[in-house]
Amino acid sequence: MKIAVAQMRTTAGELERTAERMVELAKKAADEGAQLVVFPAAALMGVWPVDPPSQEGLLLDLAEVLVKISEEVPCPCIVPVLSDADGAPAPEAMLVHDGELTPLKLSALLRSSATGQTDKHAGEGLEEDGPAPDLPVFELGGVHFGLAFSFDDLNDFDDYDFDVDVVLYLDGYGFAMDDPSSAMGVSVSDGRFMDDAEATGAWIVGVGSLGTYGTQVFTGSSFVLTPWGELAAQSPSFEEDLLIADVDPELNGPLDHPLNPEVYDCPLVAWNALAQGLTESLSQMGFTQAAVLVDGTLDSSAVATLATDALGPTNVHALLVTGIDDKLDSSARRLAENLRLPVRELPMAALSPDHALAADLAQAHLVALAREEGAMPLSNLDKTALALEVLPGSMPRAGLAPLGDVYRYAVIELVHMRNTISPVISRTSRHAFEVPAIPGIEECGPTPESRLDFVDYVLASHIEWGRPLSDIADDGGHPQVVSAILDRLASCEPARMSCGPVIVASSRTLEDVAWPLGMMWRDRARTKAERAGEGIGGTISLGDDLDEAIAQAAEELGSVAGSHDASKGQQGGEEASVPATPRDREKDMRDILNLLRDFSLTGGLAADQPEGRSGRHGQGGRPGPGGTPGDSSIWRTFSEN
């Protein structure tokens, strides 16, 4: 079967125009022999639903558009749509075939409920509840398809025995620097998809969205993988493409002419993703130009260069702030010349002898320049600064922060990569960064780079990887510094609320892990004995009846394990016995505490909630194979119960 992937750049909610283009692409694909056309997950409606009061009107307009598509496309198509489920995105895929529309996820859910298929796969994987009941599996032209919107869906196809020939993965995550799989085909050798092909024994068709939806960036790079891991076809990143591949379920390989997977260059892809995100985010806000503050520091140089690459030098207006340092002044002027930017110079001495006040006034001048030129002011704040350096009561930075989801150490890497293309940023500017002023940070490395690397390691471990403070300190050392970093992260929360939007470049933004206002409690590094619950005694109870039930279940599990060990010993000619031990009340309480931890980590009894990490930006189920770095938590989910 020939399958076409229509990698198209769209504007979310531009329903009629997008539908017209879908019909055009379907006709073109059909002319080239395609028997199924798959459109990207974000093409029609983006990745985030509208507010509930607007849902009714949107769905009515969407229904009209879908009917039009069903009447005009010449071949079967899969058209993804988006709805709202309790405030969270609920993706769906409509199969358009012979003038009919079939909602694949809803059909799968109803079929599971009607036939009791929910328990069909129970016990086949690591979990007992089986795969998601709304996981679409359908047949078309003699080929059996599975459809996945998330990594959780892919995990279900990996873990359970589905009779599918092809798995269609419709990417809805967006690019993230900490997840190679998010770059789709360009990183196929570094991501999870080759493992998915091997685990499922099916062809994997990755359908990449393209463009910027909200502040999430999608890079395209759709691909087709064979069950044995060869790359059969791939679309370019950051470009529209109609990818058509011949998928043969009967073929056992190898391909006559497979493609060689690219070597994944994360900084290069990230730079291009940020440039695309900046261009399209400004366009969505009604701007085509930007104003930047250039003072010779690392972040200001990176933002000015990124804006120039994204918008062109005639659309970037530079406010050159001088007087801080002669070397930085020289570097800032040289950067503006290299980028050919129009410049307005602002001496700090003319503002105020107070450095902090002068910096605030410079920000006000940047906003005035932007207003005068009809441009959007850009903030130079990176993710490290937003996490640790925006203090309550300080003047908020106006405008979009292109690097607001990129750690400072990663900015150094991005600038190094950009200079290999053309060396526009001076050595002085590349080293003009500050390490956040955290007590004891001097002990965490011999150089500013190594100390900054430690700070960003702690932040990423906590934010992106969701690791407890004690785990981070166990692996990286310096527990007091780790505690101070995370305390500062929480303390800066009120100031972050007044900062502008960022371009999403990670699997979790600072907004996804916002600290509750007014929460005075702070975590601290704890010993293994503390984390195991020693010393709790009998102070925690769920009620005598439940305590006894849990204790009895634990004893039964222990007796089963002991009987198994004894039988093994007897088979080996050895005498085995299980010594009787007195009831350990403290151990019972630790078991109860561990049970509470399990419910905390898994969302309690909310069985309909997906596993893995999930923030506002839909990054559930990450990462792929490999797990978290230094995954040494003794609180692994259901590890003790």
Segments and roles (model prediction):
Residues P227, H257-G296, S300-R616, G621-N641:
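ATP/NTP-dependent adenylation/nucleotidyl-transfer catalytic domains that generate, transfer
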Residues M1-L293, A304-L320, K327-S330, R334-E345, ...:
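Enzyme catalytic cores with a strong preference for nitrogen-chemistry domains
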